[in-house]
Amino acid sequence: AGFRCIKLKIGAINFEEELALLQHIRSHYSSKEIELRVDANGAFSPTDAMEKLKRLSELDLHSIEQPIRAGQWEEMARLTSESPLPIALDEELIGYNTWEEKQRLLSAIRPQYIIIKPSLHGGLAGGEEWIAEAEKLNIGWWITSALESNIGLNAIAQWCATFDNPLPQGLGTGLLFTDNVEMPLEIRKDCLWFCK
């Protein structure tokens, strides 16, 4: 289908099985062919996270989202400073809506990336605040959807297009719904195109 970036959820089954699956994918596709991202949704414990991150880093992954559950700033800051695999904050950003809270969180944890979900992070204006603060600290970012209908997905896609961010964005949830409005966007190879 032309996709160059795949995100896989991990942490739900046995770690060795998940690692074997990732090794299988990587044995068939180099990181130049397929960018692999993983999302642990906070499934790792602070005590075993570093060992798992080291093992995952051997697979030339792009990054891992939220390795430990949100709210453990000290532990997450340690991981972001010591991990051989870049860490992206996701759930960690939820609930921090003032500029000062955003500055404090990013300055304390210093992740390599943050993931902006406008529906969960204060809308488009809140997302722009996260992006501005991240860029001040040289923190990378990308935008994803969070189970919006095609109306929300269309708005997020058009907003996303206003930025000059070469990273693959996560805008693919519209196909999950069986009763959805028509979408003026279409996926061609690895890009989203406005069709109407």
Model-inferred region functions:
Residues 1-83:
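Metal-dependent enolase-superfamily TIM-barrel catalytic cores that perform enediolate-based chemistry
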Residues 4-8, 34-40, 64-65, 87-90, ...:
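Hydrophobic faces of well-ordered beta-strands that scaffold small-molecule active sites
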Residues 11-13, 43, 69, 92-94, ...:
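Short, surface-exposed acidic/glycine-rich loop or hinge patches that mediate macromolecular interfaces
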Residues 27-30, 58, 84, 136-139, ...:
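Generic secondary-structure signature for well-ordered alpha-helical cores
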Residues 46-56, 74, 96-109, 125-131, ...:
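Catalytic cores of alpha/beta
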Residues 67-72, 89-101, 119-126:
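A general structural motif
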Residues 105-145:
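Active-site-adjacent C-terminal substructures of enzyme catalytic domains
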Residues 146-196:
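Flexible C-terminal active-site loop/helix
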